[in-house]
């Protein structure tokens, strides 16, 4: 992968996670319901535009596209090269998801339990949004990555729904394409396809975002097969994408979506397609330029963006319950004051720090987890040895007379 594309993806990951965090923080602590009826400072309008559901949703769509491009694209590359890949693919995907999702579900259980005990008077954990979400069944369902698909999410961690969708894309995509993996026995290929089709149908049956999200994820995967950029200029592709996202943010909302629900889906498809065009522009563009993407902090921030996304909501709800119990629920719902903004931004900072330290015991251990999984699989079924390329014998050269004398001496 070109360095500049890799850096763009890293930047998109942490910026997207930051947008989602801002949206949820604003919803809980900053009430700007009078944004259209009263004058505000310019920065308030900037925040209103930035911390909006529509932008957060576009960030999640970009996550799906990038995941498909990286993970699904790798599957397609292996298929085209007739390479065996299922074993390593399983190791990488299971470790990637469960090393974060498993601890995140436990983290949710612990923090929600403490919050329900300490701040019961706030009533936050009794909101209709969380009614019936603290059962053992939903805890188990979240471990199986079924939240948002066949079951509600566990506790207060609603954002985990998207990770459940991604996990099952990881599982079903290579299975559905296994008939094209000619280096595997035909029986295994057909069995894998049948398993993938069965899983896809079973997961698609309950009403969820799984099927529509699959279109976006697979679009990212198959975009890796496009041999040239659709828009050659990276700036032109970026500006077009940004302009459309701005229009979506301002137009695709409220009454329009209620009256014409299909508009939201069309906007999602358009935004995701344009993001793919941006990826291709960076993939096939020149290596120079875009100095802002060359800083190392993009990778540093991206390395814990997954963890931040996975645990931010329980932290924010815990803080909201604490505020409700100490300052009163009316404080968080009043028209925003400087104190509301100060608290919200402080909480965002605390949540980012928590995400970083959480990642140190989860995401940062991915390499070690993969080695352990590989060792376990090797004990059960050793991986076939890679063929050693034949080497042609090279006749030994006779040393020069002077050299021969020194060797023999």
Positions of PLM-derived features:
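Hydrophobic alpha-helical membrane-insertion segments
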Residues: 15-24, 96-118, 302-315
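Hydrophobic alpha-helical transmembrane segments of multipass integral membrane proteins
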Residues: 19, 56, 63-67, 71-72, ...
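Hydrophobic alpha-helical transmembrane bundles that constitute the permease/transmembrane domains
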Residues: 11-14, 25, 55, 167, ...
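Long, low-complexity, intrinsically disordered segments
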Residues: 394-409
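Alpha-helical transmembrane segments
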Residues: 12-21, 103, 138, 142, ...
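Short, conserved phosphate/pyrophosphate- and ester-handling motifs at nucleotide-, phospho-/glycolipid
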Residues: 13, 61, 68, 166, ...
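Membrane-interface helix-loop-helix regions
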Residues: 41-49, 87, 97-165, 273-283
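Alpha-helical transmembrane segments in multi-pass integral membrane proteins
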Residues: 1-9, 22-56, 72-86, 149-151, ...
């Amino acid at each position: 992968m070109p360095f500049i594309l890799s850096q763009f993806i890293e930047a998109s990951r942490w910026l997207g996670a930051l947008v989602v965090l801002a949206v949820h923080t604003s919803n809980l602590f900053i009430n700007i319901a009078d944004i259209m009826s009263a004058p505000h400072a310019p920065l308030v309008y900037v925040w209103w535009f930035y911390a909006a559901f529509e932008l957060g949703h576009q960030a999640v769509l970009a996550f799906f596209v990038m995941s498909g491009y990286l993970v699904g694209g790798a599957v397609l590359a292996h298929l085209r090269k007739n390479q065996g890949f299922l074993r390593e693919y399983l190791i990488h995907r299971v470790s990637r998801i469960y090393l974060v999702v498993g601890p995140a579900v436990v983290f949710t259980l612990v923090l929600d339990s403490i919050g329900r005990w300490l701040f019961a008077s706030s009533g936050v954990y009794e909101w209709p949004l969380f009614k019936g979400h603290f059962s053992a069944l939903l805890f188990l369902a979240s471990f199986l990555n079924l939240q948002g698909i066949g079951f509600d999410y566990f506790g207060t961690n609603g954002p985990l729904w998207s990770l459940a969708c991604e996990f099952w894309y990881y599982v079903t995509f290579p299975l559905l394409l296994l008939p094209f993996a000619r280096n595997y026995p035909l029986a295994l290929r057909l069995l894998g396809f049948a398993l993938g089709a069965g899983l896809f149908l079973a997961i698609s049956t309950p009403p969820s975002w799984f099927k529509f999200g699959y279109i976006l994820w697979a679009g990212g995967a198959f975009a890796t097969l496009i041999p040239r950029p659709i828009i050659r200029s990276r700036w032109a592709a970026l500006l077009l994408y940004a302009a459309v996202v701005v229009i979506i943010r301002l137009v695709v909302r409220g009454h329009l979506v209620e009256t014409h629900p299909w508009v939201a889906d069309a906007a999602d498809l358009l935004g995701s397609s344009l993001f793919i065009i941006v990826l291709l522009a960076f993939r096939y563009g020149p290596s120079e330029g875009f100095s802002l993407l060359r800083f190392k902090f993009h990778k540093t921030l991206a390395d814990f963006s997954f963890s931040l996304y996975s645990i931010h909501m329980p932290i924010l709800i815990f803080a909201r319950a604490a505020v409700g119990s100490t300052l009163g629920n009316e404080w968080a719902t009043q028209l925003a004051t400087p104190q509301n903004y100060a608290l919200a931004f402080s909480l965002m900072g605390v949540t980012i720090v928590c995400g970083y330290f959480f990642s140190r015991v989860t995401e940062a251990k991915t390499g070690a987890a993969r080695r352990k999984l590989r060792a376990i699989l090797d004990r059960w079924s050793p991986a076939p040895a890679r063929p050693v390329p034949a080497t042609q014998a090279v006749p030994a050269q006779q040393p020069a007379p002077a050299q021969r004398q020194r060797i023999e001496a």
